[in-house]
């Protein structure tokens, strides 16, 4: 772990947890959760994707300064990273590097062929012929075999290599180019940095052979890869717990973690990590503490919980507005929710029932599990529209400033549960 600037540090392979804050007032609650339950886990308080910044009209500097100021005011004296999330272009990298971020998450999803998993052999070979000239390195992997400590065997057959090349080849090249650009920018500035690669935004899980080719190619090219976010089995939807077979996920996590140890070590990163309590212990146990978890939207939902408890009228206005925006704003998210997942606010007179339908109540959730109500997703994906609305955005911010203690406490309670689940998994791994 080394200093990168006056504020942000690189965190290495220590377990870490990213706290995204889309409003700029959540860090005191994040700090309190870390103080209560974060022992041995390193925080990343400034974390935001380029998409989130655009939707909330905030700059990289705004996000960084709000988090660092909140951190200091809350009495945090330990280290923090600074995650410039989902970077797609050199411009994205330049503006976040200049602001002082230390952790750069590369998102090459625009260069992934989402349909590759469904191609028959003929189509696969046709598509490969289109990219073959760009993938001069792929031939090195044909025929390679690897046995993991879990007993799983990885074989880079011709078909596996062709499919990986078509699906991820251009994405790998783009990621390497962007990582080299970041290295040059940070090198000229004399700042340390670390790279995360995100390949999780696909419909189908990342196979072990694909994980191997992606990571090995990046490491061979000298990329400072500190963490990788594969697409795991099951569904990792925004705002709710893991949806899928936990036994299948446990086996898959064990294999991916073993591969990360063997090649790196580098951390396995869990994106859309908010509220995935049912699988946090598995992640911590499988990785032996070498993990990173990203959260963001859940802190916005806890801001709405403050509205639910202190200004019912505002909460109802936000629900109605979010329902109007839902079909448009959901376009860039993988969600199961529909407008039928929760009744309109006008049909619910009881304030507690309204909070239950749209946010969930921890007192009703079994220990070791997270929220599952899909009403949360209606509010989750419409954050940008609410926060930039000329009426609702300022009203919500004013309310949070007036009730900062409530916001801090509901956030601390929320994240303590998540950190405790990770700690439990680490304890069984040790």
Residue ranges of model-derived segments:
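Active-site capping/gating regions of soluble enzymes
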Residues: 1-66, 70-74, 90-112, 117-119, ...
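Aromatic/His-enriched, Gly/Pro-containing loop or helix-boundary segments
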Residues: 68, 78, 82-87
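Residues at beta-strand starts and edge strands
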Residues: 78, 191-193
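The substrate-binding groove and active-site-proximal loops of carbohydrate-active enzymes
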Residues: 80-84, 161-169, 243
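Hydrophobic "anchor" residues on beta-strands that sit immediately upstream
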Residues: 81, 196, 267
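Conserved, mostly hydrophobic/aromatic
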Residues: 85, 197, 271
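Active-site-proximal, glycine-rich beta->alpha crossover segments in alpha/beta enzymes
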Residues: 115-172
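Short glycine-rich or small-residue beta-strand-to-loop segments that form or flank ligand, phosphate
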Residues: 194-201
């Amino acid at each position: 772990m080394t200093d990168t600037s006056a504020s942000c540090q690189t965190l290495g392979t220590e377990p870490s947890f990213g706290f995204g804050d889309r409003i700029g007032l959540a860090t005191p609650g994040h700090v309190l959760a870390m103080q209560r339950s974060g022992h041995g886990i390193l925080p990343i308080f400034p974390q935001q994707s380029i998409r989130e910044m655009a939707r909330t009209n905030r700059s990289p500097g705004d996000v960084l300064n709000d988090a660092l100021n909140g951190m200091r005011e809350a009495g945090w004296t330990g280290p923090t990273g600074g995650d410039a999330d989902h970077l797609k272009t050199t411009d994205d990298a330049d503006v976040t590097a200049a602001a002082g971020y230390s952790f750069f998450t590369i998102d090459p999803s625009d260069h992934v062929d989402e349909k590759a998993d469904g191609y028959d052999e003929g189509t696969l070979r046709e598509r490969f012929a289109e990219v073959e000239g760009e993938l001069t390195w792929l031939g090195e992997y044909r025929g390679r075999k690897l046995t993991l400590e879990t007993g799983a065997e990885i074989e880079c057959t011709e078909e596996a290599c062709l499919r990986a090349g078509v699906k991820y080849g251009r994405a790998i090249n783009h990621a390497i180019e962007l990582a080299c650009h970041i290295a040059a920018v940070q090198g000229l500035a004399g700042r340390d940095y670390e790279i995360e690669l995100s390949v999780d935004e696909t419909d189908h899980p990342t196979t072990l052979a694909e994980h191997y080719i992606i990571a090995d190619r990046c490491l061979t090219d000298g990329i400072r890869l500190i963490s990788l976010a594969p697409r795991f089995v099951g569904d990792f939807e925004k705002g709710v717990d893991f949806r899928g077979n936990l036994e299948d996920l446990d086996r898959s996590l064990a294999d991916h973690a073993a591969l990360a140890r063997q090649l790196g070590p580098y951390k396995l990163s869990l994106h859309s990590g908010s509220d995935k309590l049912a699988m946090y212990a598995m992640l911590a146990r499988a990785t032996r503490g070498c993990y990173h978890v990203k959260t963001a939207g859940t802190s916005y939902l806890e801001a709405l919980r403050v509205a639910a408890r202190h200004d019912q009228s505002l909460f109802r206005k936000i629900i109605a507005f979010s329902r109007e925006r839902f079909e448009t704003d959901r376009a860039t998210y993988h969600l199961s929710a529909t407008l039928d997942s929760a009744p309109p606010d006008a049909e619910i007179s009881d304030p507690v029932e309204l909070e239950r339908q749209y946010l969930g109540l921890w007192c009703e959730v079994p220990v070791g599990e997270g929220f599952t109500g899909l009403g949360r997703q209606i509010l989750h994906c419409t954050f940008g529209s609410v926060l930039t609305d000329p009426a609702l955005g300022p009203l919500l911010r004013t309310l949070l400033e007036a009730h900062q203690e409530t916001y801090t406490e509901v956030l601390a309670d929320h994240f303590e549960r998540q950190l405790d689940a990770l700690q439990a998994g680490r304890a069984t791994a040790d």
